[in-house]
From Swiss-Prot:
Name this protein carries in UniProt: Serine/threonine transporter SstT
Natural source organism: Aeromonas salmonicida (strain A449)
Keyword set includes DNA damage: no
Subcellular localization: Cell inner membrane
Keywords carried by this UniProt record: Amino-acid transport, Cell inner membrane, Cell membrane, Membrane, Symport, Transmembrane, Transmembrane helix, Transport
Gene Ontology cellular-component annotations: plasma membrane
Chain ranges passing through the membrane: 15-35, 49-69, 82-102, 141-161, 192-212, 217-237, 288-308, 330-350, 356-376
Main location: membrane
GO biological-process terms attached to the record: serine transport; threonine transport
Origin: domain of life: Bacteria
Gene Ontology molecular function terms on file: neutral L-amino acid:sodium symporter activity
Amino acid sequence: MTQQHPLMRLVNSTSLVSQILVGLVFGILLAMFMPEWAKAAGLLGSLFVGALKAVAPLLVFVLVMAAIIGHKQGQKSNMKPILLLYLLGTFLAAAVAVVASFLFPSNLHLVASSAEITPPGGITEVLQTLLFNVVTNPVKALMDANYIGILAWAIGLGIAMRHANDSTKAMITDLSHGVSTIVKAVIRCAPLGILGLVASTLAETGFDALFGYAHLLVVLIGCMLFIAFVVNPIIVFWKIRRNPYPLVLTCLKESGVTAFFTRSSAANIPVNMTLCEKLRLPEDTYAVSIPLGATINMAGAAITITVLSMAAVHTLGMEVDLATAVLLSVVATISACGASGVAGGSLLLIPLACSLFGIGNDIAMQVVAVGFIIGVLQDSAETALNSSTDVLFTAAACMAEDETLLDAASLPSREA
């Protein structure tokens, strides 16, 4: 038997999270001492994110179809409680952001102009975009990574093929296993990818631009941390009636860390799928809930929309009553659920929230420009919260139905 190379033995015996942390440290050191090399290392990050984005649409399509074809009559899918948790978590995130904005008001130094970008005209347009995403061409949905369209076609084909021959079902199941194997291989490259992402980001932008918006960033990221470590654990405890923190910390470590650096919920779908498998969750549940969560579970986006809109209000010296604040929370929740259907995501939905207070589009777009300036941290933290919560709520809903899964909550941290 061929003896394994010592370096490969070290890599295989070290957890993926530990390898990612090593990649993070090397990325920072590379940016500090060899900025030109750091910019070149950005290729590793781009390749990693590109590979994840390339495989994610096919993974979702095949897994969802295979899960529905293999679904047995009378078997629970837990989708209703998961959807409830997604909406509840997003609304509470918006409400926390409103309270934080009242307690710690932020003032913006509005910039002169913003990029040539077109925000949605209203809540109707956001919902209309989502509906049209459902009825899109399946090939176009796969090419554009339109997960609403992919889900719609995968569910439709899955239901239509429930009574197909066993050989057809076996072929689709084998195909899903094949795609999953490719995904696992891509995820093993995460340390190199994150090294490249961190090194190039620090070398090209640095953090100088962030210091002028330190207060705003503290409020934004403080809200996200409060949701991650206080509100979400309370929601999980309500579902499973056990100490929620082992599960919360596992999701943040296994999913949140990768999402923070890739800054893409779609790219993190394969990572979340792998974590769900480690937690031994039912595949027919997480195959649907994870890509759906990447589309509509947007607690981080709700915080971004609310905090930046309230910052604009405070900057202009406007008074906000309780009823308007509650309405802002509702609008932010609905808008956040449609953030994935808007080019530019949560930042371009800020003008929609600002319109509640009669703030003109010119000023609102300047607030959007501020969002782009702080995006290095804001977008990373937002994605980490959004994506890790997808797994957290899926696991909580499944564990509430099947208590035997509770023991699996700490497995990934031991096995990784």
